């Protein structure tokens, strides 16, 4: 059997997303709006398969054909007859559910490959003897031959997502390196093109020169007759001695489906903001224009407090090894009014609370743009995973001048972050009951502060294309050096493009730190309804949760490559290091032996020292993070962040050794089963599924009732068209991992 790092256990937690009550309260028109937006999101989410690994689209197509012909119960009888045990068949169901849940065969949280936990020959017998194989023998056999080996392979280079010899990514062709990624970013900056909706393909010509294709995601291809703001950029370029060509049409048939349902949703929009937003999204996905998506996002920001909230596009750049390309995601959700009222009170206090942050006013935005902050019950979240909260859009220029929205996903928090006592690792017994009682409420506070005042705070110092500065060069002083500002962002540079590989994690660390820092404020806790001893418990559990998460984070560190695979977890480890460095017994991490005789560890936080020792340490660290971000000082920012993020076996903590303990006692993230919406006549029905691997599989089998087989064919064709870019990738192992 495979290494436990690379399998999903048979007893993995599976929860259903509950949005029945929120959906019931929608009007018929709102339901139709939500339905078509959900359809657009689910179709678009299929692009994630093509953004993950070369084999993911084939695995998805194979599983879908298998379970369409026989549902999980019917296939079980066949599998047992073929000699599988109940445990082996369950392992296959869990694997299939994992592929659907992550939209690929790499975990969305941690970027680690997962493989089926049963022998390959047994699974092969089940697949080749299945009803699907009887109906279409050649197709099923070809799919199994194409993806069977890769499905199971744990060749060193295939274990994690990464660039070059560090791993697998389909944002770049297999021979691209970090140097190619940097060169491409310089090229994109020179043409004022965003990387968000692009992939990079490299071919080395006979003359030894590299030829790069920058391919934009769009319905349209490169036909110059189809004029748009982008047409002039679709051509060949010479750049620093290399050939570049900008093309478009990536994921075209998938995005065509997205556009069709966005057009249908427009008929049920509640106001002109929503209509104009959808029109711009249609333009963006049709043409491949990020500028159109920005315009749509501007209307989205202006659409305050809608009953049905949604966002769709190439959004988060966590999984691009370079940190610039966005993964497709789309969500549709309904407002939870009671919780939203608390967040609205937090927004009302935000301007006052921003002044509490530990940097000078010159480092804060010139004007606080009052954002929307709602608690939502998710109906649909298509992509590779579901977060607990979101602060979007990610476009720096919009965030600085137009604002943003914050959302907390209430029904996701309710199921994904629920804690069971027996599963609580690394805590003292006396902390466990307190932790269970206050984990949920403290996390609501942390998510609120993290999104609104973490991601929502801070100014970037920019010099525009005309040479004008958005800060006073003569009077603004760097509080870390006592001198005038020496560095800033030039026109075309963004936070992501400048800080690239550390940008996501650094920003998550800044937002998490703001949450810890401001949760000490009594006014914040009163907003959420906590006073006195309860307020102190919320603070303690919030800080305790963070330092425990810092230890759990070691699961997401790869020692062989000395890199982190998950931005949020790296951020939490950095915060743990900062609080350990503060000393005075504030935080201790001690190796122990568990009651089962195996290695264990205990995290302790001295609650009497949170304000006296923890707060000043966090204050100093937060100020440095913000100053280096504002000034675009990537050299000092990288040195600071990577210094704290380094994992060594230096005493007293011996983190590399502790990592083995963390892996020994790790718990897999829950899989979440989402409902479907179904149009029956003019009415939209909500279809729910049981909380099990089989239920999750059924939800996906019923997700595309009109065109499932056609979509699988499209995915196979799109994957096959680019397959040459990743041939022979597995054989090249990274150094030290052969």
UniProtKB/Swiss-Prot annotation:
GO terms for cellular component: cytosol. Keywords: Acetylation, Aminopeptidase, Cytoplasm, Hydrolase, Metal-binding, Metalloprotease, Protease, Zinc. Its cofactor is Zn(2+). GO terms for biological process: proteolysis. InterPro entries: Dipeptidyl-peptase3 (IPR005317), Peptidase_M49 (IPR039461). The keyword 4Fe-4S does not apply. It catalyses: Release of an N-terminal dipeptide from a peptide comprising four or more residues, with broad specificity. Also acts on dipeptidyl 2-naphthylamides. The active site is at 451. It holds the Pfam family Peptidase_M49. Belongs to the peptidase M49 family. This is Dipeptidyl peptidase 3. It comes from Mus musculus (Mouse).
